[in-house]
């Protein structure tokens, strides 16, 4: 730390957050400092990072290898009681706690962080200065500071001078709540938000993604109320300035498909859409690494170098990484600053209005076509449905698909009612003349997953407009218009019925999946607008 940096850190008054007796503050340390801190030989347990042959540090996040939605809480008070989409109003994770319970949880975290040497990372959430959040993250764990330095937008020296946080995140991963039963909570772990105080607190879970997605949930509360779309999507832009956004749940291909050598990446996960166009919320990417190969995903593989941070991967004794090993979790990840990808929008991660909106789904039922163009009504229907499906493998190789319906392709992060996001998105799409497509990156009647080469060919056809020139035919039940051929794509997969030896198999699977869609969509039919959308969905 320079003398100047030391002075700046010393000027930070952490007592305003209830943190006392802090022995030292490292404010916005360099990557070099963080590397030294997180690989210190005296560190133990989950605090310790290990060096890998690719130059990046790998860490273990403990028993939590993903977010813990059952432990997510929001204070119900005058700020939130009438605006927030609460868990008793629909299928979501926004469980209410009282201000009194919040005070107890907050004091567990402040007690944990007091008297310690702390890392403070000040960063921005949102590339647009008018609507971004100034976020201050406080943690005692070096690699958690590294994670947020990667994931939030890094301020310049000048921007740090007068930095005043709009939101504070206190990560007390080592603190747990012994009184959770008395509080009526799910477990000793907690991720809680107070929108009046503008504070997030974390206890019991070490998973880095809680900090990133926590601020996403807050943007999802603040932006739509200003008429700005807040979206769980990746985005990129072509040479002619044509912007595409890719919505999708985890594992459907958002990061992979938006990282395209022919186009500049805007961002891989969280974006807003305002009067100027599409802008990234983040300063980094958070890519899945399970079964990562240099051949299939060279950009992501090459981004794993010094300053990237790997989570829960298997590191062999010779420092090499086994990306195929999912024994700890299938959700192995890497975070890296966005400039680790060569082809990005610079200097600010933003571009114009989107012309193409792509809904990614990984259908494990083998029913949906690899691509279909959506009508405006179908766009709303599929956005509110937010369907994907996972294959749950068992040791005997029996695989049953598990459907997931997640409103707006991100229900876990929504803080307002899903129809509010649909309304804002459709308004933005109409104003920009954008078109929507559904792209299935999942399985078909062959039992194999649609190849990444075919999916990339489909995306190319959407982006260059050749799909709009293609002849189409109608897929029954779901009433989807699909192309009969596309350049560079295996034509035999475009109608999913053709991938079955017996077409009746598709019929019975389609009926099963359609019933699931209809049952899920019933939650939106309590008003006229929702009822009117039913005919845009599957019909039996």
From Swiss-Prot:
One of its GO terms (cellular component) is cytosol. The keyword Oxidoreductase does not apply. GO terms for molecular function: ATP binding; metal ion binding; phosphoenolpyruvate carboxykinase (ATP) activity. InterPro entries: PEP_carboxykinase_ATP, PEP_carboxykinase_C, PEP_carboxykinase_N, PEPCK_ATP_CS. Substrate binds at residues 67, 207, 213, 333. Pfam families: PEPCK_ATP. HAMAP family: PEPCK_ATP. Monomer. This is Phosphoenolpyruvate carboxykinase (ATP). It comes from Aliivibrio fischeri (strain MJ11) (Vibrio fischeri). The gene is pckA.
């Amino acid at each position: 730390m320079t003398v100047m940096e030391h002075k700046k850190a010393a000027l930070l008054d952490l007592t305003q957050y209830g943190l006392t007796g802090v022995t030292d503050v490292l404010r916005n340390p360099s990557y070099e400092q963080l590397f030294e801190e997180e690989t210190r030989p005296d560190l133990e347990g989950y605090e310790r990072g290990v060096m890998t042959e690719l130059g990046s540090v790998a860490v273990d996040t403990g028993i939590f290898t993903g977010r813990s939605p059952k432990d997510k809480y929001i204070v119900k008070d005058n700020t939130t009681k009438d605006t927030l989409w609460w868990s008793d109003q629909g299928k979501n994770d926004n469980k209410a706690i009282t201000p009194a319970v919040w005070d107890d949880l907050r004091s567990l975290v402040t007690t944990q962080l007091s008297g310690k040497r702390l890392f403070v990372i000040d960063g921005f959430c949102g590339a647009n200065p008018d609507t971004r959040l100034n976020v201050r993250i406080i943690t005692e764990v070096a690699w958690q500071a590294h994670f947020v330095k990667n994931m939030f937008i890094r301020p310049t020296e000048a921007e740090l001078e007068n930095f005043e946080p709009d939101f504070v995140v206190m990560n007390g991963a080592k603190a747990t709540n012994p009184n959770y039963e008395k509080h009526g909570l799910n477990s000793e772990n907690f991720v809680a938000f107070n929108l009046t105080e503008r504070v997030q607190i974390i206890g019991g879970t070490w998973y880095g993604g809680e900090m990133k997605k926590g601020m996403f949930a807050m943007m999802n509360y603040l932006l739509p109320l200003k008429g700005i779309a807040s979206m769980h999507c990746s985005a990129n832009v072509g040479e002619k300035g044509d912007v595409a956004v890719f919505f999708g749940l985890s594992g459907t291909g958002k990061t992979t498909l938006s990282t395209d050598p022919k186009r500049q990446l805007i961002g891989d996960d969280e974006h807003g859409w305002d009067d100027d166009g599409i802008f990234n919320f983040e300063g980094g990417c958070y890519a899945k690494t399970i079964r990562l190969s240099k051949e299939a995903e060279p950009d992501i593989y090459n981004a794993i170098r010094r300053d990237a941070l790997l989570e829960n991967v298997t590191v062999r004794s010779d420092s090499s990484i086994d990306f195929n090993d999912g024994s700890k979790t299938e959700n192995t990840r890497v975070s890296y600053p966005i400039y680790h990808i060569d082809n990005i929008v610079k200097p600010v991660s933003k571009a114009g209005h989107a012309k193409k909106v792509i809904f990614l789904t990984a259908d494990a039922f083998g029913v949906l076509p690899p691509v279909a163009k959506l009508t405006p009504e179908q766009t709303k229907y599929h956005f509110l449905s937010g369907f994907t499906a996972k294959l749950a493998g068992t040791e005997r190789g029996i695989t049953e698909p598990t459907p997931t319906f997640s409103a707006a392709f991100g229900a876990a992060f929504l803080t307002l009612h899903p129809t509010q996001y649909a309304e804002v998105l459709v308004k933005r799409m109409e104003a920009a003349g954008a078109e929507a497509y559904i792209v299935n990156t999942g399985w078909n009647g062959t039992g194999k997953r649609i190849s990444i080469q075919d999916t990339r060919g489909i995306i190319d056809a959407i982006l260059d407009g050749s799909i709009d020139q293609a002849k189409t035919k109608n897929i029954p039940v779901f009433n989807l218009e699909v192309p009969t051929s596309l350049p560079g794509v295996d034509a035999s997969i475009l109608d999913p019925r053709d991938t079955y030896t017996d077409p009746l198999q598709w019929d019975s699977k389609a009926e099963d999946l359609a019933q699931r869609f209809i049952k899920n969509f019933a939650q939106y039919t309590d008003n006229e607008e929702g009822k009117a959308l039913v005919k845009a969905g599957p019909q039996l």
